[in-house]
Amino acid sequence: MSTTTSSTKSIVTAGKSSRDIRRELKALEKSGRKVPSSPARRQRERREQVAGYGFLLPWLIGFLGLTLGPMLYSLYLAFTKYNLFKDPEWVGLDNFVRMFTEDPNYIQSVQITLVYVLVGTPIKLAAALGVAMLLNYRDKGSGFFRSSFYAPSLIGASVSVAIVWRAMFSTDGPVDSTLQVFGIDLGGWVGNVALVIPMMILLAVWQFGAPMVIFLAGLKQIPQELYEAAEVDGAGPFRKFKSVTIPMLSSVIFFNLLLETVHAFQVFASAYIISNGSGGPAGMTNFYTLYLYKRGFADLQMGYASAMAWVLVIAVAILAFILFKTSKGWVHYAGDNR
């Protein structure tokens, strides 16, 4: 056996460079033949393994120390009464019971957030898809328009934009002043209980650039032959959109729907700035994350805030699971026979 191994090694290495040797050794591995091993090769493999773990170690330390560790600690705090000044006191499920039975502000924050998500997300995706389709049929100047529409999604969540938005929709702002020219006096949007949620939804829809770019990339991948075949069958624009564009774009729609839904549940900065941190008027901008922040950092009820955070995590996870389950009936991927 040793004679065979040494003869194989001599055949592989005779008069060849190290690159050729490695190439032939890989070919031997793929063919299933026994590859001669040497101490030098085993040592090199060990060095490569150590180097791989070395590159992985910084991320692993960061994940354990900054993500997994705090998450597990917050899970523990969710079952305690903790206010930063005293040691956590175990209370079991009291925080969760109190949340749903004794805290009307919490129920209101859930309702407001659901309205924001269920109304704002479809409108945002519809706007993104509509603009993406327009850009898909326009070649001249499409780069400029693509950048212009995408820019709000980069700056929309910033504090400065929220300040500008608040000024625009205030009582003496340009939006209200323009409406007054046409005889419509709303008295400002920021302090109006009926209009502040539509104003927040409008701010979210204005940031449709990110899903628009993803929709545009998906539209570019649809074969034109499908539209030509639909035209031969007598399909009009609406029929082509329904029977070709939507099915071929369904996986992209699902991706954007999932991403934007999760993102909508996390609205915080704009609500905080526009309401000056109060969640007003009458709690109508007291979104879930803003109320969580107020409970944790204003009222110092860290245990209660941790319980709220985990309810949100579980709710979003359940929603994502439902979306994945229901997607089997309407999302089509390449190669599907449905």
Show which residues each predicted segment covers.
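Transmembrane alpha-helical segments of polytopic membrane transport and secretion proteins
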Residues: 1-56, 140-142, 323-338
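A structural signal for multi-pass alpha-helical bundles of membrane permease subunits
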Residues: 48-338
